[in-house]
Amino acid sequence: MFPVPANLQRLADQIDGWLDLRCPDRALALLAPMLADANGRAAGLVLRVRANVRLGEFAAALPDLAELRTLAPAEGWVDLTEAFCRKRLGDLPSAITCLEGMLARDIKSDIGHFNLGCYLALTGERDRAIDEVTLACGLNPECRDFARDDPDLDSLRNDARFRVLLRQAPADAAGNPGPLDDDEDDDDEPPPTGPRDHHRRN
């Protein structure tokens, strides 16, 4: 996502390891050299965001995400993670705005459509929510499995359109791909922070 200078790679790997071990406090304690290095700061900010998200310090992650946005305005990970943080802080309108902005740039992000559908469902916008989850399932059939279990979508479960969506196979009997699935490669990787809700397939 953001390059790590060679002289900081070992430290970055160590910090990443602590995050993988679910020890974000240990990761935070090691970040100062990366944040102080002009070439390593962006990668350091990503790691600090991941640590704060793991700790549940969602408000603390927002300034770092804002700085990352100035460095890489089109980076979808920033939008997805900010949306997650704002949702956890109870600001669903801002979370939805983040995802809408990301999808305006990358309409083929399955996780973007799926998470937007979840957030819309929580606000009571059922029709839009079903539309977004349908798009996500067309881009990535695995999203149908996530939709079956995701509590954010509970308000949709009595809707006939949603029930039909969950019963559909990813391809029809003739082997045609689902809607919007116009290539064979799935190049939409989930963010590395952990959320899906945030990130239901992380």
Residue positions per predicted region:
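Structural marker of alpha-solenoid helical repeat scaffolds
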Residues: 3, 37, 71, 105-106, ...
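Alpha-helical segment of the N-proximal tetratricopeptide repeat
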Residues: 4-56
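"A position-specific structural signal for the A-helix of alpha-solenoid helical repeats
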Residues: 13, 47, 81, 115, ...
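Alpha-helical adaptor scaffolds
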Residues: 43-111, 118-122
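TPR/TPR-like (Sel1-like) alpha-helical repeat modules
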Residues: 121, 126-145, 167-173
